[in-house]
Amino acid sequence: MEKHIILLPGDGIGREIIDSAKQVLTAIASEYNHRFTFEEHAIGGSAIDEYGTPLPDKTVDACSKADAILLGAVGGPKWDANPSHLRPEKGLLGIRKQLGLFANLRPVKTISSLLYASPLKEEIVSQADMLIIRELTGGIYFGTPSERTTNGVVDTLQYSREEIERIVERGFEAARIRKKHLTSVDKANVLESSKLWREIVEEKSKDYPDVAVNHLLVDAAAMKLVTQPSFFDVIVTENLFGDILSDEASVLTGSLGMLPSASLRADGLGLYEPVHGSAPDIAGKGIANPLAMILSAALMLEHSFGLVDEAKEIERAVNDCLLQGFHTADIHIPGGVQVGTKQMTDAVLENVTTKSISDSICSSYV
């Protein structure tokens, strides 16, 4: 298989971790007789510095022609005082919108060898294994008007029926191939948009009689995530709620440095990135955890290229590294081997080409 991948290092630790993912993908291509080509472009703060905009036209053009996109991270205090249209985050929001990447998938699965790192008790978090599906291109982040007024401010939450239907269908499809349980999160006791959301979920449920559906208000869902995370299989929700809940859920694993994500459109084009931010405080120090970026590459192989075995090979290699005791600073414990970005990447590369030491291959993150 031959595929062309756009690399968007972005800001902070983005370049360090995206280089790690590129090395692992190159190793996988060699092992499985694929050919991956790479092309790098700017986004976020680095694009502002070089081109005067967080999302250059050449970046959008290249991404629109690619088979998939890997993004490191965007943002940093250097650009915090910029006007809103010149903030790094506008580059990420813009590329999602322009490419029509409407579905954000964030798998959250605790890893047995890292249970110590979770802030929750082991008996609460040990069975957590969920997929959060967040609508990405509608809602209050994109509604108009959004502006300051003479005496205040206005933001607008708006959704079309089509926007809700397509993300809800994605949720049902994901639940159907997992544990057949879909939780829809809304605020239907207050918001008109949520009332329509809930109506559409009920309508679509008739097409998926094999999937059990329940509805939770967003505040109740937030509580249940930390009191009974094993309750959830697939969560589907709108943009703002999904943004907050997915960040909350990411804490269950003990480190943002372990969590990948995918932003997809209907034809399979996807942008893949770690959940964590740009971590400017450790940029250039060689200590960033590359595993979320590497696991994001695994998601890319599975969802955009259909290379399930290759994706599982990466997941197995990451799992074996952890079982061997390799940990970056964010997940380090006494008795383990604390390593930096390069050493952890090298350990993954070593495990990609060796037989698993674990009793069973780790399950897919989705």
Curated annotation (Swiss-Prot):
Subunit composition and interactions: Homodimer.
Annotated site location: Important for catalysis: 141, 187
The family this protein is said to belong to: Belongs to the isocitrate and isopropylmalate dehydrogenases family. LeuB type 1 subfamily.
PANTHER family in alphabetical order: 3-ISOPROPYLMALATE DEHYDROGENASE
SMART domains linked: Iso_dh (SM01329)
Function of the protein: Catalyzes the oxidation of 3-carboxy-2-hydroxy-4-methylpentanoate (3-isopropylmalate) to 3-carboxy-4-methyl-2-oxopentanoate. The product decarboxylates to 4-methyl-2 oxopentanoate.
Protein name stated in the entry: 3-isopropylmalate dehydrogenase
Gene Ontology BP terms: L-leucine biosynthetic process
Co-factor remark: Binds 1 Mg(2+) or Mn(2+) ion per subunit.
Record-linked Pfam families: Iso_dh
Family matches, as HAMAP family: LeuB_type1 (MF_01033)
Top-level enzyme category: oxidoreductase
Residues holding Mg(2+): 219, 243, 247
Domain of life according to the entry: Bacteria
Catalytic activity: (2R,3S)-3-isopropylmalate + NAD(+) = 4-methyl-2-oxopentanoate + CO2 + NADH
